[in-house]
Regions:
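Membrane-interface helix-loop-helix junctions at transmembrane boundaries of multi-pass membrane enzymes
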Residues: 217-225, 312-334
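Periplasmic/ER-lumenal interhelical loops and adjacent helix-loop junctions
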Residues: 46, 50-55, 224, 231-318, ...
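Membrane-interface coil-to-helix junctions
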Residues: 22-117, 139-160, 249-254, 262-304
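Contiguous transmembrane helix-bundle modules in multi-pass membrane proteins
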Residues: 177, 196, 328-388, 394, ...
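Membrane-embedded helix bundles of polyisoprenyl
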Residues: 19, 113-126, 132-213, 226-246, ...
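Start-transfer (signal-anchor) and selected internal transmembrane alpha helices
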Residues: 1-32, 226, 488-492, 496-504, ...
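Soluble catalytic regions of membrane-associated enzymes that act on cell-envelope
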Residues: 95, 468-471, 499-732, 737-744, ...
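Active-site-proximal, structured, solvent-exposed surfaces of multi-pass membrane proteins
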Residues: 2-4, 8, 677-820, 833
């Protein structure tokens, strides 16, 4: 190992452990306070924790095909791939039993910050000669406002940590012809979260055009084609996860384009003000913000601890009149952030999100590293000049004294040296002038923003855009103090400025991240110990049968343990579930809708969990914990999943009925597609309220109990099947409240049957007598995805082997005295040149 390699590793270790320590300081206080546990708020407590715990158990038990507990049922891979299946931190958590997740998740957060710092350092160091400046910049990236605001979304942080590897791998390919790093960077970024892959592709395309194609033109096309080939290979290696996820997610109505007309070109004034706040203020609690917009989940924060955009403006000032790819990239980011349709492109035009802001944050950190390097270099030159000036002044005095035949006192010499040295040291460097200008500009913008919100009336209906004056005051002070300290340390301070600057930046990073954790916890979170007790206690419930659901929309009590429920929420679920709620006239977007009368009976939700005993009725099971107790009650009138109908009505007629009674009506009669009426009418008769009775709340219990006569028996439910026996008095249709995903196939008494879509659920024809009904499920795209991955692995292996052989031949063909030593050849400075 040469000195260069040893020094490089030292800086990598420094970057990792510096960010690791900052993460520990940010999280350790709350982990310690909660006896080793960690919880946060909202989505984190009721989604991220249950998802991780349930998926842990599901993977270890092999239940990874159909997820019965994800809402009303969904494809496990499709449902969980957006959140955790490709998430490195989740795979680390699999080393522990699921019940320990709340003990390790806080430390997993810390590791994410450490790795975000490490990967950002790896990319930034290629653009500066001073690795210590790159280390400082890694802290800016890892502890940006984006990382603080998005604490709620646990799975976002892995994306941020892996993103710099994408740029690093691409640079290695374009600049040095290194094959492989970009390929695997694409793989990791693709499987960690397919949603962010879209933004990665757009940003990388802009990066190629603005960094390589603009200055180099056609010369860069060879590298581009190599990059495209490696990108395809990287995606092929991830097809085992990407292809099933693609087939799954295209069913989701949240994946749609909703930009048109003038709103695609210009945001409203409020949104521009909100974007500016995300640059000025540290990341806030999404659901309870201090100003501009009270609650917003768009991830609109790109704050850099302490410095804000001061160093970005300073870098632009230093580069005035010079061409540089970073200028083009910053302009691209600015225009994209300000134009709605361009901003929306990063999420495939699906909603108003700003979840790509971690990308410009990396550029901001690089600007900071470049300014610090420039300042450090100029400061060293100034220090040497001051020393030379002091020596020259002393020499002149000594010569003058010798000419006069006098002896000069040492104090006079020291005074002259100090005066001359001070004169040089007080000179303002170009980098200091740039930082001063950046501080003035950014400070004026900050003051204008603060005073505007404090003193300007927004509208008659909403006079003030400040919702929490205390938090607004704190963040205003943090913003202005950071600008002031940046100016003070980088412009006014002449000695040990870098040490003081880094320590201050470190404090700001820890404070802003720790404050975000604190505010999230105080705004919404249940005490971690209480939440953990809730999880453990509900996990003791053991009386539930496979053919029934729980009437609940509480993820921690049901989804965590794989209990089927009527309202477990997840954003990524089978598209059939959306069709079901749409048929009921309900909207399902960021939460499961409140269940209407009859929904529990329709979906076979027989059980109810209560935390206090009812005055009437005996629970079928009682479990007690330290802070929580659960009483499990059942409704004997609820039929299991799988029961028959003797009447039908068409979907178009169903939509003409009262929305409030639609769930009861679905329980009363089979709601069929209009085009299937001719087939179904041969078996069932058309529903008539006059002859068959009305479907309303008063008749609900009787309607539900009527299905018990011909309901599922001998039920078997596995990860890829649902089977039961139904004894029918006559030919009819059996209904199953299982989402009609495209992967389902059905057979009755061994003969395959067409599945009838019932408002997103399933029904099959049954004959008079005993019917053995078997539903089997295969994940759409999984088999093809696995084959694609195997093919990609084979091509990748051949590609890398051939690349290595070609590299060896090229090395052997080079003259022995090519002019570079090994350490020089490996130096990142060579790539920078």
């Amino acid at each position: 190992m040469n000195d260069r390699t040893r020094k490089d590793r030292q800086y990598y270790r420094t970057a990792f452990f510096l960010n690791l320590a900052a993460g520990i300081f940010s999280f350790a206080w709350t982990i310690s306070d909660q006896r080793g546990l960690f919880s946060l708020a909202g989505d984190f407590d009721v989604q991220q924790i249950p998802f991780a715990m349930y998926a842990n158990d599901a993977i270890k038990s092999g239940n990874v095909i159909w997820d019965w507990s994800l809402d009303l049922g969904s494809n496990f891979i499709g449902g969980m791939s957006f959140y955790i299946l490709g998430n490195p931190s989740f795979w680390v958590s699999l080393l522990f039993p699921s019940r320990y997740f709340m003990f390790i998740v806080g430390w997993l957060y810390v590791l994410k910050y450490a790795f975000a710092g490490l990967t950002s350092f790896a990319w930034i160091r290629r653009h500066v000669s001073d690795e210590s400046s790159a280390v400082v910049a890694s802290l800016m990236y890892a502890f940006s406002g984006y990382m603080a605001e998005d604490l709620l979304f646990y799975h976002f942080h892995d994306v941020v940590a892996l993103f710099p590897l994408l740029l690093l791998g691409f640079d290695l390919l374009m600049q040095e012809g290194k094959k492989g790093p970009f390929l695997f960077a694409v793989l990791f970024n693709a499987i960690v979260n397919y949603y962010f892959l879209v933004g990665d592709v757009i940003f990388l395309a802009a990066y190629y055009v603005l960094r390589y194609f603009v200055p180099e033109g056609k010369k860069s096309l060879k590298g581009l084609f190599q990059g495209l080939f490696e990108a395809v290979l990287g995606c092929m290696l991830g097809l085992w996860l990407l292809l099933p996820s693609f087939f799954f997610v295209i069913q989701n109505p949240r994946v749609k384009m909703d930009y048109h007309g003038s709103n695609s070109l210009v945001f409203g004034a409020e949104r521009y003000l909100y974007i500016l706040k995300g640059l000025l203020f540290p990341g806030e609690v999404m659901s309870d913000q201090s100003a501009v917009i009270a609650h917003n989940f768009a991830s609109c924060s790109a704050y850099i601890p302490m410095v804000g955009l001061v160093l970005v403006i300073a870098w632009l000032e230093l580069m005035k009149g010079r061409k540089h790819w970073m200028k083009r990239m910053l302009l691209f980011c600015l225009v994209t952030a300000c134009v709605p349709i361009l901003n929306a492109a990063f999420s495939l035009f699906a909603g108003l999100y700003h979840r790509w802001y971690y990308m410009p944050t990396l550029l901001f950190a690089l600007c900071g590293a470049m300014v610090l390097e420039r300042k450090d270099r100029e400061d060293q030159i100034r220090t040497r000049r001051a020393e030379h000036a002091a020596n020259a002044a002393e020499l002149r005095l000594r010569r003058d004294a010798e000419d006069r035949g006098e002896e000069i006192p040492e104090e006079t010499l020291r005074s002259a040296r100090r005066e001359k040295s001070r004169e040089v040291l007080l000179e303002t460097l170009p980098s200091e002038r740039a930082v001063r200008k950046g501080a003035v500009i950014w400070g004026c913008i900050a003051l204008a923003f603060i005073f505007f919100l404090l003193f300007v009336k927004w509208s008659d209906s909403e006079p003030s855009k400040i919702y929490h004056i205390e938090e607004f005051t704190v963040w205003s002070c943090v913003c202005l103090l950071g600008i002031l300290l940046t100016w003070l340390f980088l412009v006014r301070l002449r000695s040990r400025w870098k040490t003081v600057f880094v320590l201050s930046l470190y404090f700001f990073a820890i404070f802003t991240m720790g404050a975000a954790v604190f505010l999230y916890q105080t705004a919404h979170a249940e005490d971690a110990r209480h939440h953990y007790d809730r999880l453990l206690t509900s996990g003791q419930i053991s009386c539930l049968k496979d053919e029934y659901r729980v009437n609940s929309n509480e993820n921690p009590e049901t989804l965590t343990h794989g209990f089927m429920a009527s309202g477990n929420f997840c954003s990524t679920v089978s598209g059939s579930i959306f069709r079901f709620y749409e048929a009921l006239g309900l909207k399902r977007d960021v939460r499961s809708p409140d269940p209407p009368e009859g929904l529990a009976e329709l979906v076979s939700a027989r059980y109810t969990f209560e935390e206090e005993a009812r005055e009437e009725g005996e629970p079928v099971q009682t479990v007690e914990g330290t802070w929580h107790s659960y009483y499990v009650y059942e409704d004997p009138s609820v039929a299991p999943i799988g029961f028959t109908y003797d009447t039908y009505m068409t979907y178009s007629d169903f939509l003409d009925t009262n929305k409030d009674n639609r769930a009861i009506l679905m329980l009363k009669t089979l709601v069929i597609p209009d085009e299937k009426e001719e087939v179904v009418s041969r078996v069932l008769r058309r529903y008539s309220a006059k002859e068959d009775g009305s479907a309303n709340k008063e008749h609900l219990s009787r309607i539900s109990a009527s299905h018990l006569e011909e309901a599922a028996e001998d039920v078997s439910r596995t990860t890829d099947s649902y089977s039961c026996t139904i004894r029918a008095a006559s030919d009819s249709y059996a209904f199953f409240s299982i989402p009609n995903d495209s992967g389902w196939k059905a057979s009755v008494n061994g003969e395959e049957q067409e599945i009838l879509d019932i408002c997103g659920f399933m029904a099959v024809p049954v004959s008079a007598g005993e019917n053995r009904i078997v539903f089997t499920y295969t994940v759409p795209g999984l088999a093809a995805g696995i084959l694609g991955t195997l093919a990609g692995a084979l091509i990748t292996a051949v590609y890398l082997v051939l690349s290595r052989k070609m590299k060896k031949r090229e090395a052997q063909a080079l003259p022995a005295d090519e002019g570079l030593t090994g350490s020089e050849a490996d130096s990142p400075a060579r790539a920078r040149r």
